[in-house]
Amino acid sequence: MWDDVKVIESSDANVRKYVFSKSNAVAEAVLYKYPTYDKRTVICCSTQSGCPVGCRFCGAGDNFVRSLRWDEIVSQPVRLLEDTGVDPANMERLQIMFMSMGEPLLNLKELIPALRELYARFPNAALLISTIGPQTDFGPVLSISKEIPTIGLQFSIHESTDERRDKLIPFIKKSSLKRISLLG
């Protein structure tokens, strides 16, 4: 799947960053333990290699390469969970979040089958989609959330007005705060 995986561990060993790479893509995922993996495990994984959104505060910036395939998305939490040494079924709290590199809702075609596969493998996991709220049809997200009861949608707002938000997130085709509040 991936040609190379680099792992960087924090000095206190509570956080591990993974960089997955191959000739035409890079993805990042992060593994957190609170305070142990069997108590609470949180994974943040990528849905795209780079990101087309261009948030001013994000390291992915405007360096968009491509959207990841569903199996490339799934392979990230699978690898991270293997590295915990704990059976995911025995974790008191497991969260898999789509919020590392890329805008998940700009890759719904691949995200939805990834969500189905992850739910089949880890039915106890909360599957959380973090989004800036691009102007898109939210129907597929609402539909899959009825099929998979552990899915959650969270909006990355970052600012309290559309004007200030536009400076921080220059992506033109994002939903207004009013639309997000109506979806929310």
Locate predicted features.
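Flexible, acidic/Gly-rich N-terminal and inter-domain linker regions that tether
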Residues: M1-T41
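Short secondary-structure boundary segments
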Residues: V5-D12, K17, I73, Q95-P104
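Short linear Ser/Thr-Pro motifs
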Residues: I8-S11, S46-T47, S130-T131, S156
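Basic side chains
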Residues: K17, Q76, R164-R165
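Residues in well-ordered beta-strands of folded domains
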Residues: V19, V30, S46, M97-M99, ...
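Non-catalytic surface loops within mature trypsin-like serine protease
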Residues: K22, K33, S49, I157-E159
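Canonical Radical SAM [4Fe-4S] cluster-binding loop centered on the CxxxCxxC motif
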Residues: K33-R79
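Conserved AdoMet/S-adenosylmethionine-binding subsite of the radical SAM
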Residues: L81-G184
